[in-house]
Amino acid sequence: MKQTASSLAGPGLACLTLLTVLALGSGCSSVRDARLAEIRPGPRCDFTEGATFDNRPSYLSAGQENALIGALSRLFGVYNKDIHQVTIRQEASRLVARFHAADGTGIEAAGSASSKSYSAEGEQLVINRWSSCKPGEAGAGCVWSRVELSCTVENDLVVKQVDGGAVLLALIIPMGQRRTQFGVYRRVDPAE
């Protein structure tokens, strides 16, 4: 049987159609608070002598009020509404937190982890890092999250939460997502 131009176009057209569907079906998205670019970074936060910050942020990315970064004490697993200030001190390879009421009295953090291990990466201290990769019925994917602490030139604390994920749907179509949200906590003098 002699092949014609139309019969040769069949496999080529099918391949082109498949590639077009894959290109349109794959994708990435990135959500980043634009105000992050306005933050003027300072030197690495020095917590060796201890530093006290407001527990509530002076700025918080939209929709993050109930998130981990919605209050500084939540980073250490404490959800007490009476906490007004958090003092963070660097001890060995851990950041240790002390919690204070408005009148300066200490608030005990029963049943919580009032310290976190950290790693230094450039001018940032990284805590709460985790990742997970798993296969599933529809494909395979990975998710990750980390919380970065840094200081501004005004010596305020910036807590940035970076989350992301990637998936290979049907082991063919790649998709990815990354989200960056943050809160700024003012450095204050400890309440007496």
State the predicted function of each range.
Residues M1-C28:
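Sec-dependent bacterial lipoprotein signal peptides
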Residues L13-L18, I39-R40, S119-G122:
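Short, intrinsically disordered, charge-biased short linear motifs at domain edges
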Residues A14-L16, S115, T180:
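Intrinsically disordered, low-complexity, compositionally biased regions/tails
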Residues K81-P135:
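Predominantly extracellular/secreted and cell-surface proteins with exposed
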